[in-house]
UniProtKB/Swiss-Prot annotation:
Residues 110-130 have a biased composition (Basic residues). Residues 20-29 have a biased composition (Low complexity). This is rRNA-processing protein CGR1. GO terms for cellular component: nucleolus. Keywords: Coiled coil, Nucleus, Ribosome biogenesis, rRNA processing. The gene is CGR1.
Length: 130
């Protein structure tokens, strides 16, 4: 090689991707904060997001929310029905117990056959009235 020939230029290095540059800039702190609270996130300017979602996407989100609400409502109704069933079972047991005690009290005063006749008559009347 002679000294008069120019040296070949080094191959140009590819530039970093433009999408990676802003992310790296946001992540890297820009020196010390004035108030010294370096553990806080860097504040960004307020950008309203009002017109940024498409109408179709909003419709999809509304459908999803409606489905979720429907499922929640169904689950609440099932839970309430189970609760009412338990309450009704307790009431039925208490009523049966009171009726049994009433007949026992009656049996102390009256003859056994007379009490049984009354039981049958009351059952008939109960069936007719219900």
């Amino acid at each position: 090689m002679s000294s008069t020939e120019p040296a070949p230029a080094p191959a140009p290095e590819p530039a970093p991707a433009p999408a990676a540059a802003p992310a790296a800039a946001a992540a890297a702190p820009k020196g010390m904060r004035k108030n010294g609270k370096n553990w806080h996130d860097v504040k960004t300017p307020f950008r309203p997001t009002k017109g940024q979602t498409s109408y179709a996407r909003r419709l999809e989100e509304r459908k999803a929310m409606a489905a979720i609400k429907e499922k929640e409502k169904e689950m609440k109704e099932e839970k309430e029905a189970e609760r009412q069933r338990r309450i009704q079972a307790i009431k039925d047991r208490r009523a049966a117990k009171e009726e049994k005690e009433r007949y026992e009290k009656m049996a102390e005063k009256m003859h056994r056959k007379r009490v049984e006749r009354r039981k049958r008559r009351e059952k008939r009347n109960k069936l007719l009235n219900s």
